[in-house]
Amino acid sequence: MAAKEVKFGRDARERLLRGVDILADAVKVTLGPKGRNVVIDKSFGAPRITKDGVSVAKEIELENKFENMGAQMLREVASKTNDIAGDGTTTATVLGQAIVQEGVKAVAASMNPMDLKRGIDAAVEAVVADLFKKAKKIQTSEEIAQVATISANGAEDIGKMIADAMEKVGNEGVITVEEAKTAETELEVVEGMQFDRGYLSPYFVTNSEKMMVDLDDPYILIHEKKLSNLQSLLPVLEAVVQSGKPLLIIAEDVEGEALATLVVNKLRGGLKIAAVKAPGFGDRRKAMLEDIAVLTSGQVISEDVGIKLENVTLEMLGRAKKVHVSKETTTIVDGAGQKSEINARVSQIKAQIEETTSDYDREKLQERLAKLAGGVAVIRVGGSTEVEVKEKKDRVDDALNATRAAVEEGIVPGGGTALLRAAKALSIKGKNPDQEAGIGIIRRALQAPARQIAHNAGEEAAVIVGKVLENCSDTFGYNTATAQFGDLISFGIVDPVKVVRSALQNAASIASLLITTEAMVAEVPKKEAAAPAMPGGGMGGMDF
């Protein structure tokens, strides 16, 4: 086992603080509309330019093990905030640094670290309650666009695009961000439920120009197993032919005699039909077939529930206004499912999302939720160079997450103003002077984000903060982008409560741990062995 080095008390905390400062100083320059860029070296390819706090934090690894521990703990603040709210990483880092700096000073002045922590926790609770009280719910598309614009560092086109996407697919809908092949940034919306399975035979195509199958007002047969035997399929085919409607078959597979008969019927013009494989695998396939059944008001034909294919009636089939099938995808538009049943299914999936611990499962459940709840939108981010596209994609991701958070818990005035004003809520008293000091640490730390935003814009931070606090209106603040004081809500400068709250809670949580640290253990760095000496003697027989 390698030898370990141990640091105690003040020495340990000072080294932690040094690591915290190095990481925070690199991250905080990106805060606000006039935040600066950080250039990150990549071992291959062009350097990456970003204004995304968490991307900068992830790149920092320090040589000194004790300092690195401090940096990594602060990095945890940024990643945790990013996981919960998807934005606010830089604000969380700035708050974390401010709380740690003040806390380490207090501990050095012989205050009790545990009482400081109790004071900090009580103060954070009071501030979060105040933020919820002042939160304004988001209703209109304009408000959504404002939040997205701010989080995208003032890019109005991105803000509007995200607002359009959320309007079209609903707040629960899936919005994915991809890199475009062109210089333009564009939005594509897929209405209805789409899954990644195309037609099983090109002979089903009805639109030969686009190689698509378009079925109007079709019946939908949802079958869990393979279909290869024609006999069991005949009764339902005859019933559909008599109704004069098209038919979409979704099954594990359709092969052999069954597929051949369907193709022959289609070519002879007797039946407008298409067959596709069921989406997903294993248990997820069963769940997705159930989703399709709920959406189209049909039943999953499965021997598990005692329904045989030969006994199927038209009432058991699903219905939809339109179905489009391409070589790779199937889209069901406007299924005939009951609103109440769809909502019940949505609630069930939401409950599963809450319970799951796997990120992969959560992502797949969210996809299912979106397909049921409204549809899928894709924002394709374009740019002139690869570096520009990556930087813009970072901002679009941030903006999208911030917007979702805003819809969830509401908004408060932005630019660090909500936290500045929340200091008024700290009229609570600690049980002793050390707890009072903990409350005071948060009171001072709440000014840090507003000061940093002003500083990054080249303004005098103390003057800006002083002027904002002179005015008693909750929404009065400073617009750094235009260098104006006024009503921040009407300027459209707002922050999601979820982002501000998560930033403060995570910063205080990690900072409290750092303040109450009394010892640190790390491996002793290995000394590099000196390079061996060159063998002597020269090369015989060579005279110069």
Curated annotation (Swiss-Prot):
One of its GO terms (biological process) is protein refolding. Keywords: ATP-binding, Chaperone, Cytoplasm, Isomerase, Nucleotide-binding. InterPro entries: Chaperonin_Cpn60_CS, Cpn60/GroEL, Cpn60/GroEL/TCP-1, GroEL-like_apical_dom_sf, GROEL-like_equatorial_sf, TCP-1-like_intermed_sf. Disulfide bonds: none annotated. ATP binds at residues 30-33, 51, 87-91, 415, 495. It is an enzyme of class 5 (isomerase). It holds the Pfam family Cpn60_TCP1. The keyword Chaperone applies. This is Chaperonin GroEL. It comes from Bartonella bacilliformis (strain ATCC 35685 / KC583 / Herrer 020/F12,63).
